């Protein structure tokens, strides 16, 4: 494991990439409504990246042993899709929820964030899922302090989610970020004491991204080799921020229009 520690200047560069991500995610949120396709949202994001002189860190991405390269600039995961949904012809309907994961490269530095958006009016249980997942993110961010360890972040989010009767997704989680989209350390969403648990130190920049299911935590991958869905077909939500570890409070580099009321999370 090789963890990078960033200078203030480098963190500011990552923040600039995060600002582009944040601005475009706000546009995607506003454009999300019944009748819109996930492909149209992807095209909007691509156009806005080009207009800002930024590039996508999603499109063409190929992790080890995964074929084909990811075809979109956003991940568009609808309802029971957890992460890595491929944008295309799917038409959003009233009552859907869509997780939009999006990143950008600005001057060689990466930003990454995700939101889950209700499409029109959604069922109370779906609304509560979004609120719990968003609040879990802020619980996790509050634990992202120098002197704590990676699994303190995982534990804070998981305990919050499970206390609300939902499940934290297995296998997937957050990551370091900087010159590459995915760097060390891995930030598991579910606490596993067998996993590496490095100390959090000032200068680390990480992406924290709880993925929460209404049902059980299990998932499966579809035949497109990308889309991950809940094993039991239940709804899933996903929120993410890029966060710098400092000598004091965690510094959120993709603070999407104050997604929550504070680090404690929204009351649910």
Regions found by a protein language model. Give the residues of each.
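Active-site neighborhoods and metal-handling regions in enzymes and metal-associated proteins
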Residues: 1-268
């Amino acid at each position: 494991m090789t963890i990078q520690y960033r200078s203030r200047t480098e963190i500011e560069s990552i923040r600039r990439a995060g600002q582009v991500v944040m601005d475009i995610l706000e546009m995607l949120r506003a454009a999300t409504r019944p009748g819109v396709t996930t492909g149209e949202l992807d095209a909007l994001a691509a156009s806005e990246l080009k207009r800002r002189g930024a590039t996508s860190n999603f499109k063409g991405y190929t992790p080890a042993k995964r074929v084909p390269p990811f075809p979109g600039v956003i991940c568009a995961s609808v309802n029971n899709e957890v992460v890595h949904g491929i944008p295309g012809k799917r038409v959003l309907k009233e009552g859907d929820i869509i997780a939009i994961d999006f990143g950008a490269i600005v001057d060689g530095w990466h930003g990454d964030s995700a939101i889950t958006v209700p499409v029109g009016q959604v069922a109370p249980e779906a609304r509560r899922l979004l609120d719990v997942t968003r609040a879990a993110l802020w619980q996790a961010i509050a634990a992202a302090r120098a002197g704590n360890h990676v699994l303190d972040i995982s534990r804070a989010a998981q305990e919050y989610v499970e206390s609300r009767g939902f499940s934290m997704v297995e296998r997937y989680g957050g990551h370091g970020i900087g010159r590459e989209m995915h760097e060390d350390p891995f930030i598991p969403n579910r606490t596993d004491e067998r996993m590496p648990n490095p100390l959090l130190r000032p200068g680390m920049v990480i992406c924290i991204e709880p993925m929460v299911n209404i049902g059980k935590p299990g998932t499966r991958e579809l035949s497109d080799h990308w889309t991950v869905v809940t094993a039991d077909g239940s709804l899933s939500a996903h929120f993410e921020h890029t966060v710098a570890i400092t000598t004091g409070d965690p510094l959120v580099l993709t603070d999407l229009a104050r997604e929550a009321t504070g680090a404690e999370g929204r009351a649910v």
